[in-house]
């Protein structure tokens, strides 16, 4: 998937670094469930017979990501929300589906939407979810990783030390060593700290996955034209559709 689905701007080393610290980031920044969600109202995608639950299980298995807590809110407007939440004193990635996806949608519609959003459960991408999809937050955390590796960042040390404590006090030693090793390789490869470009590439990857799962450009374009703009996204619906059209005629798509 990395070679033929992920965008070239999704730097391999940034991805690895964020993946190594994602569990600690998620634990640090997890929030209680919103009041309108009750744990007993979860939909179990392993046993629920509804189409949306079966499609969620299918997409989860195809992408090989962890199982999210799933809540269905058919009477409330909206598309999809992915929350970095806490349940039973542990991090529980939580996906909430609203009326735009639960009314009048078939398998192809659900395959696109679920594929597009469930790729965010991939640990490096989930790190960005935990950071509220803020490019500024992402930059601060990446510079914190550089600081921990004794690299110059140009940021105030006190601020970076505070972030470092929050993250690295939650990381096992093996993950710290992995992060340091990846950071060295990142620097040796002349990597760019333009993490905003990386964030945009992860968004593009989500749309590509959704398109591959539904295998219908018309359906993909229809959903993109109707979806609400996500926080942190710099792409217009036209940009997203153009990206998928170009991808659909690329060599990567046919491999």
Task: Briefly describe each language-model feature range.
Residues 1-92, 99-108, 123-125, 132, ...:
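Hydrophobic or amphipathic, alpha-helical segments that drive membrane association/targeting
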């Amino acid at each position: 998937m990395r070679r033929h689905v992920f965008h070239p701007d999704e730097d391999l080393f940034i991805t690895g670094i964020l993946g190594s610290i994602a569990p600690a980031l998620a634990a640090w920044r997890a929030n209680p469930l919103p009041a309108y969600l009750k744990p007993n109202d979860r939909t179990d995608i392993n046993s629920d017979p509804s189409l949306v639950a079966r499609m969620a299980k299918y997409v989860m298995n195809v992408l090989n990501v962890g199982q999210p807590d799933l809540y269905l809110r058919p009477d409330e407007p909206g598309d999809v929300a992915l929350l970095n939440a806490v349940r039973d004193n542990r991090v529980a990635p939580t996906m909430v589906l609203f009326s735009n996806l639960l009314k009048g949608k078939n398998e192809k519609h659900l395959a696109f939407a679920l594929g597009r959003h469930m790729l965010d459960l991939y640990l490096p991408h989930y790190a960005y979810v935990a950071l509220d999809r803020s490019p500024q937050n992402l930059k601060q955390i990446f510079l914190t990783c550089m600081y921990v590796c004794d690299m110059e960042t140009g940021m105030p040390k006190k601020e970076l030390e505070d972030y470092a404590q929050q993250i690295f006090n939650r990381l096992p030693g093996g993950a710290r060593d992995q992060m340091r090793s990846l950071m060295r390789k990142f620097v040796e490869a002349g990597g760019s700290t333009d993490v905003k470009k990386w964030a945009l590439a992860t968004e593009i990857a989500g749309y590509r996955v959704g398109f591959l799962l539904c295998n219908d450009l018309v359906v993909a374009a229809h959903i993109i034209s109707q979806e609400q703009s996500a926080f942190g996204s710099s792409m217009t619906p036209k940009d997203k559709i153009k990206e998928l059209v170009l991808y659909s005629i690329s060599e990567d798509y046919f491999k």
